[in-house]
Amino acid sequence: MFRMAVLIAAAWAATILCVCVAVAADTATRPVNPYSGNAQLAQEGGSLFNQYCSHCHGQWAEQGERPRDLRRLRIRYGDDAISMFYTTVSTGRMEKGMPVWKGVLSDETLWKIFTFLETVQTED
């Protein structure tokens, strides 16, 4: 009986350790926006957004279609919004009409656009 209790406790400890390592790894691999909170660069990002993205996502990201409404990134993806943005913009989603922008736009430009998008997130 004691041996079974020890095995169960060890299994729980291993499970908790795996979850903690997975959460830490996920957080460690999440990209970091170097311009987050910079109002001037957010304004530049808005202009860049209107130049490169607005034909599908609307001027100033005001697109009513939910799949393309980038004001809802935080609602849809929570803490993973930054990863979803960077991955989608970098690698595209050709099946949904999203082109690959990596190599076309610099990382600096992508982060300025994301900095702008951080300022227009909606709560509903």
Question: Locations of the language-model features?
Answer:
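Axial heme c-ligation environment in periplasmic c-type cytochrome domains
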Residues: 35, 64-72, 91-124
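A generic structured-segment signal
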Residues: 40, 53-54, 85-89, 96-102
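Bacterial N-terminal signal peptides
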Residues: 9-19
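Gly/Gly-Pro-rich "capping" loops immediately C-terminal to redox-active cysteine motifs
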Residues: 35-46, 61-90
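The canonical Cys-X-X-Cys-His
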Residues: 45, 49-59, 98, 113-117
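Processing junctions and N-termini across compartments
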Residues: 18, 47-50, 92
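Electrostatic cytochrome c docking/interface patches
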Residues: 22-48, 124
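Positively charged n-region of N-terminal signal peptides that target proteins for export
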Residues: 1-5
